[in-house]
Amino acid sequence: MTKMVINPNRKLSRINRQIYGHFSEHLGRCIYEGIYVGENSPIENVNGMRTDVVEALKEIRVPVLRWPGGCFADEYHWMDGIGPVGSRKKMINTNWGGVLEDNSFGTHEYFELCRQLGCQTYINGNLGSGTVREMSEWIEYMTFDGISPMSELRGKNGQQAPWKVDYFGIGNENWGCGGNMNPDYYANEYRRYQSFVRDYNNEHHIQKICCGAPHEDYEWTKEVLATCFRRTSEEQHGFMDGLSFHYYVYPEGIEIKGSSTEFDENVWYKTLNKAVYIDELIRRHGKIMDEYDPLKKIGMIVDEWGTWYTCEPGTNPGFLYQQNTMRDALVAGITLNIFNKHSDRVKMANLAQIVNVLQAVLLTEGDKMIKTPTYHVFDIYKEHQDSNLVESSIETEMIGVEEEWKVPNLTESVSETADGTLHLTITNLSVDQSFDIDTTIIDRSVKTVKGEIVTEEIHAKNTFEEPECVTVKKYDGTQITEKGIRFTIPACSVLHLEVR
């Protein structure tokens, strides 16, 4: 019998709802077809946004949406995406498939989408190929509530009132597609550009996100922070509110990657091992951040994460379209548990990407839409949003095929909502073994337990022909005990228990 202990008396940190955020880039069929079809489309829409997609995303309480990139952000010139749709300047999307971008989805459309979703805004600015003036004028266009050239232009384009920009990224992946910069050079450019990202509304601070490292690039983290903190006061905390971090799970490596649907048990465990590895990366990058920011005023912003496979056969390789199986559900559950556990430092995360790209929560084909296994994990984890992380631990054992890629059999996180309800989310990484778990809940008498679970065999997926092969199912296998609860978690599953 596996032992688990929960201590609700020890509240460790608040789990920001933004940890459950998403990412939408002008890439493949994410924006166009996936989200935006235009007002004249036969597909049901409101102001051009697909009704089915918006309603599905509202169900999982999308808290924040990043846009327009990604690598696209550092080639995006915002003025090309405003004004009458038919007269907007076109461009070639050189990063993603070399296709024509008509800019019919721009600033106004993005804010309309966020309005429909009821989510916060996270805009990534163009440092790589844009100017300081261009970035400054975009902020003025979006947020200035007064008479100015940019606010008047906004009004001319149909939006009199300013919008709220909650987060603004100063460049993206500037160590790579955003300019191939060295860390000290980028950091100095960051300091310059962010100076002109002004808070025109004193009651609403725009949180500035500095471009952080990919994977194990600890040198980037160290040098960017050193340069940003040089000759500054403690109150300025490096001129930033957040430092981004990107991590993708490539099962077979960055070159080959591997199939999204055809894999054996060893590749299953290899993939999950790489998902678990993000815990070490957060700890090590976080330790460097602690040297400069011991009070944790700067959030770690994991604004790109997820699985990355070889594209589906017959699709444009620049569109990054991939299927989604129970393997992705486990990656999502594992990763979100880790983010919860590090919520003292991790303040936002954005799954890549929201529709039709990489580890998407939704896939579309014409007027059809399906929810992926990853979607259902976000659905059963949504009660963690803005709850308090409480102290918890569970006994684990290492499982797998090859020694190098073994993983802990279980991961977990526990939060408490304002009304005292405990929410346990647990993943079972085993292909074929269930585990009995005896849980002690300190100083708490359990009255009721509700459960829901996402579980199927490891290759299970939803398709347009069979859209509900993987869904959320009711789980009623919990027994209330004198000290807490006892339950069995099936193989290859993600479980949520609501304990009152």
Please report, for each region that a protein language model flagged, where it lies by residue.
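Non-catalytic accessory regions flanking glycosidase/transglycosidase catalytic cores in CAZymes
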Residues: M1-G242, I278-C311, T315-R500
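Histidine-centered active-site/metal-ligand motif
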Residues: H246
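Active-site His/acidic residue clusters
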Residues: V249-K270, T315
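Active-site-proximal helices and loops of the catalytic beta/alpha 8
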Residues: Y250, L272-A275, D279
